Swiss-Prot record:
Homodimer. InterPro entries: ATG11, Atg11_C, ATG17-like_dom. Keywords: Autophagy, Coiled coil, Membrane, Protein transport, Transport, Vacuole. Residues 634-648 have a biased composition (Polar residues). This is Autophagy-related protein 11. The gene is ATG11. GO terms for molecular function: molecular adaptor activity; protein kinase binding. It holds the Pfam family ATG11. The keyword Membrane applies. It is found in: Preautophagosomal structure membrane; Vacuole membrane. It is a peripheral membrane protein. It comes from Scheffersomyces stipitis (strain ATCC 58785 / CBS 6054 / NBRC 10063 / NRRL Y-11545).
C-alpha cells in the first residue's frame, strides 16, 4: 500500500495552509479557483493569483506533479486598496489565557491540614498552567509556520517578478547592444574619407576591360544614406537610452524590495532568537512534575517534613513555573504582533512589485514596436531601424568593396571551373564509360550465343536474339550568369592573383589579403576535388572488362586460393582500354577516307572542343609519369600529352602556392612599419626564426635523405615484384619504364624544392636590409616628434594665460548676477503678499466651477467610451456573422442577414487554420458605415480634454497655492463651462438628439427582417446564427457520408500499392528489388564468397541486403523482399578498415544502410 501524496495550498497573506490529496479532483482551473474562493472568502475568482515554487505561474495541466501552491489576492496589489480586505487577513479568531500567579501558598498557617490543602490547590493551579501553556505552545508553533509561509510567499512573488523583469531585460539588452554596435561602427560621418580613398584606386584590368571600383557606388545614394542615418540614428539611440534608464531604475527598485524583505527576515531572527520554545516547555513540564512528585512522596512517606515541601513550592517551584508561563505568553504575543506587522508591510511590497511589472510591461510594448513590423506612426519604429541598418551596410561598401569584388572574382572563377569539369569531365566520361560497359556486355552475349546458340535452335525454331539499351547522357540547361556586375568578363586564375597583389599594394586593410588568399585556396581545393571525381568516373568501365575465360580462371583460382588478384584485374582492364583507345584514334585519323589526300589530324584541339576542359593549359610533349598506384592507371589517357597536361596543372598550382607565400612575406614586411616600439625586438626574433629555419632545413635534408634511402629500398622491392609479376602474367615492359621515370621525376621535384628554399633565403636577406632602412626612418620621425612636443608646450602656456583672464571676467559677472537676483527675490515676495490678500474669495469660487466642469467631462468621456465599446461589440457580431458566411445588409430601410459565399476564404494572416476571423480591418457589411455615421457625436467629445485650461491645484492645495490664481483664470473657467453646456445641448437635448438616434440604430429592434419565424429565437442576430448552425449541421452529415466512400477507395488503393516495388525513400513495409552487386575493396578479405546485394534505387544509394543465410540468395539473379528493418551506419576514420563495421569497403563519410527484408514470392 502506497502513501498518499498531498498538494499544499498556502495563503500568502495569512500563512495558513491546507492539504488536498492527489490526484486533484477538480477538472479545470476555474473549478479549482472556486474551491479556493470558498476557503479564502474572496468575492470573485478573478481576484486570485496562483504561483508555484520558484515564482512560476500555475500550469493546471501539471498540478498533480506539484507539491505547493501559493494563493495571492490581487486586490492588495493596487496603489489604493480597501482597508477591509487587509483587516480580513489580519483578524485573529483565537485568544489565549494570560497566566496568573498562584494564591494557594499565600497563607502563613502552620497547621498540617491547611498546609496540605494549600499544596493540593497549588498542584491544581500548576496543572491548569501546564494545560494553558500547552495550548499556547500549539498556537505559537502555528504562528511560526504562518510567518515562515508568508516569507516563502514573499520570496515566491519576488522570484516571479524577478523572472518577469529578467526576461524582458535580457531581450532588451540584446537589442540595446545591437543599437550600440551600429552607433559605434556608424560611417555616416567618415564615409567621405573612405570614398575618396576608393576614388584614388587605379583601374584594375581584366582581359581588355578596366574596372574602377568606385564606379560600383552611387555618390548621391551614399549621401542620402548618410543624411538619413545622421537624422534618425541619434533618435533611436536616445529612445533606447531612455528605456535603459527605466530598466536601471526598475533594477534599483527591485533591490530595494529585496532589501525590505531581508530586513523583515532579519528583524524576526533578532527578535525571537533568544527564545527556545522546546526548552521553555521542558522547564514548565519539569516544574509541574516536581510539584506532583513531591505531593506523592509526602502522601506515601510520613518522614518527609510537610513544612519544608510547602516552603520549597512557595519560594521556588511556583514562582519559576509562573515566570516561564509568562515568558511563553509574551513570546506568543510577540509572534502575533510580528505576523500582523508582516502582513501589513507585505502589502507595500506587493504594490512595489506590481509597479515594477507595469513599468516592464511598458518597456516590453515599446520594445515590440521597435523590433517587430507594425503599423505604428511613430517616427522611431522597426522600419526605421531596418532602414538605418541597410544604409549602414551600403556605407560600409566604401571600405569593404575591394574585398567584396575579390570574393566575386574568386566565386565566378570557381563556378566556371566547376561547371567546366562537370559538363566536360564528368558528363562526357559517364557517357563514354556507360558505352564501354554496354560494349563489354555485347561481346559477352555474342560469345555466349556462339557457344550455346546452336543448341538452343535445336530446342526452338526461333533464333535467339539479344538487345541492349542505348545510353545518351546529355547536359540539360545552360550556365547561369550569377554576377551581373562582371557582365561577360571571363575571369582567369592569373586575374585573381593579380587582383590580390593589387589589393595588397593599395590602402586597403591587411586582413583583406588574408581573406582573399584563403578563398583562392578554397577555389583550388574545390577544383582538385572535381578532378578526383573525374578520375574515379573514368575507371568505371574497367570493372566489366574481363572476358569469359578470364572470369572462369579467376573463379577457379578463387575456389583454390580463396582470394582474387585485383592488380591482375586492373592490368587486364588497362590493356583493354588501350586497345579501345587505339581503335578510336585510328578511326579519327582515317574517318575522311573518301577525301584525298588522307592526312593525320595532328592539330591541337580548339577551344570549342567539348572533350577538353577550358581550365587546362596547353599541353607539352613530355613523357607520361608512371602511377604509384595501379588503380590510377585506369585514368583516361588516350595520348601521352593528356598526362602532361595534368602535370602542368599541378605545377601551376605549385607556382601559385609559392606566389601566395611571397605575398604573405611582403605582408609581414609591411606590418613591421607600424611596430615602432617593438622593432628591435622583432628584428631579434626574426634572426632567431631564421636560425631555427636553417636548423629545420638541415633536419629536413637529413629526413629527406633517409626517406630517399627508404624509397630506393622500396623501389628495389617493387622492381623485384614487377619482374616476378611480368614473368607470371607477361606484363608489358613499359610499366616498369614508367615507374623508373616517375622516380626520376620525384628527384627533379626535390631539386626544385631546394631551389625554392634558396629563393626564400634570398628574400629573408632582402627583408633584413629593409629593416635597417626602416630603423633610419623611425629615428627621423622621433626627431620630428620632439619638435612637435616643444611646440605643444608653448601653446599650453598661452592657453593658461588666456584662462586666467577669462576667470577674472567671469567672477565679476557672477557678482552682478547675485546682486540682481537678491533684488528680484525681494520684489517677488512683496508681490506674493499682495496677491494673497485679494485672491482668497475668488479662488474658492473658481475651484468649485472647476470641480463641476471636471465631473461633466468625466461623465461625457465615460459615455463616449461606452458608445465605443458598444460599437466594438457590434463589429465583433459582424465578424462572427461573416466568419459563418453571413452578411449584415440593408434593403431600403429594413436590415437583413443574408447568406453570402466567399467570406470564409478571407482567413487571418497570422493563423491560416483559423476560420473564425477575417483578416481585414473592417467587416464587409455596409451597415457599419451607417452605424459609424450615427456615432459622429463622439468626435465632439474627443477634444474635451483640450478645453480644460491649466489648473493651479486641487481643492486640497488651494490655500497653499492661492496666490497663483487671478481674474484671467476665472474668465477661462466661465468660458469653459459655457462650452461644455453647448456640447451637452447639441448631443443630448436637441430636437433630433444624436445620442437617441445612435441607440435606436444600434439596438436593431426596429425595421429588421428575421431569417425564420420562431417563437424562441426572436432576437435579430441569434435568429440568423441558429439557422446557420442548422444548415451547417445538415451539410456535415452529407460530408460524413462522402468521407466514408472516400475511405473505402483509399483502402483499395493502399492494397494495390502494397504490391508495387519502391525505388527510393525506403521505409519499413516497402517492397524492394535486390540485385547482386560488386564492391571495389581497397583491402583483401578472407572470405570473398559472400555476395553483396544492393537495393534497386533511383537517387537512394548504399542500401544493402542483410544476408544471414547464404542459401537464401544462392543461384539467384534477383530477389524481391519486404523491408522489416533498416539500420543506418556511417563510415568513419575509426571503422573504415574494420570489415565488421564496413563490410562493403565504402569511403569515409559515406552513410550506408543495412536492410533486413523478408522474401516475397509471387
Amino acid at each position: 500500500m502506497t502513501d498518499l501524496s498531498y498538494l499544499i495550498i498556502y495563503n500568502a497573506h495569512t500563512g495558513t495552509s491546507s492539504r488536498i490529496p492527489k490526484p486533484i479532483r477538480y477538472h479545470s482551473l476555474g473549478d479549482f479557483k472556486r474551491f479556493l474562493q470558498t476557503q479564502l472568502h474572496v468575492d470573485s475568482i478573478d481576484n486570485l493569483f496562483l504561483l508555484t515554487s520558484f515564482g512560476i505561474k500555475l500550469n493546471f495541466g501539471l498540478i498533480n506533479e506539484l507539491n505547493e501552491v501559493y494563493v495571492f489576492d490581487k486586490r492588495l496589489f493596487g496603489n489604493s486598496y480597501d482597508p477591509e480586505v487587509l483587516s480580513q487577513y489580519t483578524a485573529e479568531s483565537f485568544e489565549v489565557v494570560k497566566p496568573t500567579p498562584s494564591t494557594a501558598l499565600a497563607s502563613t498557617e502552620t497547621q498540617i491540614r491547611i498546609i496540605s490543602s494549600s499544596l493540593k490547590s497549588n498542584q491544581g493551579w500548576a496543572r491548569a498552567i501546564v494545560q494553558d501553556c500547552h495550548h499556547t505552545e500549539e498556537l505559537a508553533k502555528e504562528l511560526v509556520r504562518n510567518i515562515n509561509a508568508i516569507f516563502k510567499s514573499l520570496n515566491t512573488i519576488f522570484q516571479f517578478a524577478t523572472n518577469f523583469i529578467n526576461e524582458i531585460e535580457k531581450n532588451f539588452n540584446s537589442y540595446l547592444n545591437y543599437i550600440k554596435l551600429i552607433n559605434y561602427k556608424t560611417l555616416h560621418r567618415t564615409w567621405i574619407d573612405s570614398y575618396n580613398i576608393l576614388k584614388q584606386y587605379p583601374p584594375f584590368k581584366i582581359k581588355d576591360a578596366s574596372v574602377f571600383l568606385v564606379d560600383f557606388l552611387n555618390h548621391d545614394k551614399l549621401l542620402e544614406a548618410a543624411n538619413y542615418v545622421s537624422s534618425n540614428l541619434p533618435l533611436v539611440v536616445s529612445k533606447f537610452n531612455g528605456m535603459s534608464e527605466t530598466i536601471n531604475s526598475v533594477g534599483e527598485e527591485k533591490l530595494t524590495v529585496d532589501k525590505e524583505i531581508e530586513s523583515l527576515r532579519n528583524g524576526s531572527i533578532n527578535e525571537f532568537k533568544d527564545v527556545n520554545l522546546s526548552e521553555l516547555m521542558a522547564k514548565i513540564y519539569s516544574l509541574s512534575r516536581s510539584i506532583t512528585n513531591d505531593l506523592e512522596q509526602v502522601s506515601n512517606n510520613d518522614s518527609i517534613k510537610l513544612d519544608e515541601v510547602y516552603k520549597e513550592h512557595k519560594e521556588n517551584y511556583s514562582p519559576l513555573l509562573y515566570d516561564n508561563a509568562v515568558e511563553l505568553h509574551n513570546y506568543f504575543l510577540g509572534l502575533r504582533k510580528f505576523k500582523e506587522k508582516l502582513t501589513k508591510q507585505s502589502v507595500s511590497i506587493f504594490n512595489s512589485i506590481a509597479n515594477l511589472q507595469m513599468k516592464m510591461v511598458s518597456i516590453k510594448s515599446n520594445l515590440k514596436t521597435l523590433t517587430t513590423p507594425s503599423e505604428s506612426t511613430d517616427p522611431i519604429s522597426f522600419e526605421t531601424i531596418n532602414t538605418i541598418k541597410k544604409y549602414e551596410d551600403y556605407l560600409s561598401l566604401n571600405i569593404d568593396l575591394p574585398l567584396l569584388f575579390g570574393f566575386v572574382l574568386i566565386e565566378k572563377r570557381r563556378q566556371f571551373e566547376w561547371y567546366d569539369f562537370y559538363s566536360k569531365g564528368i558528363v562526357n566520361n559517364v557517357s563514354e564509360q556507360l558505352s564501354t560497359i554496354i560494349d563489354h556486355e555485347k561481346l559477352f552475349r555474342k560469345i555466349w550465343l556462339r557457344k550455346f546458340g546452336n543448341f538452343l535452335t535445336l530446342l526452338s525454331d526461333e533464333t535467339p536474339t539479344t538487345s541492349l539499351p542505348n545510353i545518351d547522357v546529355t547536359l540539360v540547361g545552360i550556365k547561369e550568369e550569377t554576377f551581373k556586375i562582371l557582365h561577360d568578363i571571363q575571369v582567369e586564375r592569373s586575374d585573381i592573383v593579380n587582383y590580390i597583389a593589387f589589393v595588397e599594394s593599395s590602402k586597403a586593410s591587411k586582413n583583406f589579403v588574408e581573406l582573399l588568399n584563403k578563398n583562392f585556396r578554397d577555389l583550388i581545393r574545390s577544383t582538385n576535388n572535381m578532378k578526383k571525381i573525374t578520375r574515379v568516373i573514368s575507371s568505371l568501365g574497367t570493372y566489366t572488362s574481363l572476358s569469359g575465360e578470364e572470369k572462369s580462371k579467376i573463379l577457379s583460382k578463387e575456389d583454390e586460393e580463396g582470394e582474387i588478384d585485383f592488380d591482375l584485374n586492373l592490368i587486364k582492364g588497362l590493356k583493354t582500354r588501350i586497345k579501345k583507345l587505339e581503335s578510336l584514334l585510328h578511326q579519327q585519323q582515317y574517318k575522311n577516307l573518301t577525301s584525298w589526300p588522307v592526312t593525320r589530324n595532328n592539330v591541337a584541339p580548339s577551344s570549342s572542343d567539348n572533350r577538353l576542359s577550358l581550365i587546362i593549359e596547353p599541353q607539352k610533349k613530355t613523357v607520361t609519369p608512371p602511377k604509384s598506384d595501379p588503380k590510377q592507371l585506369l585514368q583516361k589517357q588516350s595520348v601521352p600529352t593528356r598526362t602532361s597536361s595534368a602535370q602542368s596543372a599541378v605545377l601551376d598550382s605549385t607556382n601559385i602556392d609559392i606566389r601566395l607565400e611571397l605575398i604573405k612575406i611582403k605582408k609581414e614586411n609591411t606590418e613591421l612599419i607600424n611596430e615602432n616600439s617593438a622593432l628591435h625586438q622583432s628584428n631579434d626574433e626574426s634572426q632567431k626564426l631564421i636560425k631555427d629555419l636553417r636548423k629545420e632545413i638541415e633536419e629536413l635534408k637529413a629526413i629527406n635523405a633517409s626517406h630517399r634511402q627508404e624509397a630506393d629500398a622500396k623501389l628495389l622491392m617493387k622492381e623485384e615484384e614487377f619482374r616476378l609479376f611480368k614473368l607470371d602474367n607477361k606484363v608489358d615492359t613499359k610499366l616498369v619504364e614508367n615507374l623508373e621515370k616517375k622516380v626520376e621525376q620525384r628527384d627533379a621535384q626535390v631539386s626544385k624544392l631546394k631551389e625554392d628554399l634558396s629563393r626564400v633565403m634570398e628574400i629573408n636577406t632582402t627583408s633584413d636590409k629593409e629593416i635597417i632602412a626602416l630603423n633610419s626612418t623611425i629615428s627621423s620621425m622621433r626627431n620630428e616628434l620632439n619638435d612637435t612636443v616643444v611646440m605643444k608646450n608653448d601653446l599650453l602656456s598661452n592657453i593658461s594665460a588666456k584662462e586666467v583672464e577669462h576667470s577674472k571676467e567671469r567672477n565679476g559677472l557672477e557678482n552682478e548676477i547675485k546682486t540682481l537676483s537678491a533684488k528680484v527675490d525681494e520684489l517677488t515676495e512683496d508681490y506674493e503678499n499682495l496677491m494673497e490678500i485679494t485672491q482668497s474669495r475668488q479662488k474658492n469660487a473658481d475651484l468649485l466651477v472647476n470641480d463641476l466642469n471636471n465631473i461633466i467631462i468625466k461623465l461625457m468621456n465615460d459615455m463616449k467610451r461606452l458608445a465605443e465599446n458598444i460599437f466594438e461589440y457590434f463589429l465583433e457580431f459582424c465578424f462572427v456573422l461573416e466568419s459563418m458566411g453571413l452578411l449584415l445588409t440593408m434593403d431600403g430601410d429594413v436590415y437583413k442577414i443574408t447568406r453570402v459565399k466567399g467570406l470564409r476564404s478571407k482567413k487571418t494572416v497570422d493563423d491560416p487554420n483559423d476560420t473564425s476571423f477575417i483578416s481585414i480591418e473592417k467587416p464587409s457589411s455596409k451597415v457599419i458605415d451607417e452605424v459609424d455615421k450615427s456615432m459622429s457625436w463622439v468626435t465632439t467629445i474627443s477634444n474635451l480634454s483640450s478645453i480644460l485650461p491649466e489648473v493651479p491645484g486641487t481643492s486640497s492645495t488651494a490655500s497653499e497655492n492661492g496666490h497663483e490664481s487671478n481674474e484671467e483664470e476665472s474668465n477661462k473657467f466661465n468660458s469653459q463651462s459655457l462650452k461644455l453646456i453647448t456640447i451637452f445641448n447639441e448631443i443630448f437635448t436637441a430636437n433630433n438628439a444624436k445620442f437617441e438616434d445612435f441607440l435606436r440604430i444600434i439596438s436593431f429592434q426596429e425595421n429588421v427582417q428575421l431569417q425564420e419565424d420562431s417563437a424562441h429565437n426572436s432576437k435579430f442576430f441569434l435568429n440568423a446564427i441558429s439557422k446557420r448552425f442548422r444548415d451547417v449541421e445538415g451539410f456535415a452529415k452529407r460530408q460524413t457520408k462522402e468521407n466514408k466512400i472516400k475511405e473505402q477507395e483509399i483502402h483499395k488503393l493502399v492494397g494495390r500499392l502494397a504490391t508495387k516495388i519502391s525505388m527510393n525513400g525506403f521505409q519499413i513495409g516497402d517492397l524492394v528489388l535486390f540485385l547482386p552487386t560488386r564492391i571495389d575493396r581497397a583491402v583483401e578479405v578472407a572470405n570473398e564468397s559472400i555476395q553483396p546485394w544492393a537495393a534497386f534505387n533511383i537517387g537512394a544509394p548504399h542500401y544493402f541486403l542483410k544476408v544471414d543465410d547464404e542459401e537464401r540468395t544462392k543461384n539467384k539473379e534477383w530477389m524481391v523482399g519486404r523491408v522489416e528493418s533498416i539500420e543506418e551506419n556511417k563510415v568513419t576514420d575509426e571503422n573504415a578498415g574494420d570489415l565488421s563495421s564496413n563490410p562493403f569497403q565504402l569511403s569515409v563519410g559515406v552513410v550506408w544502410y543495412l536492410v533486413e527484408a523478408k522474401e516475397e514470392h509471387f
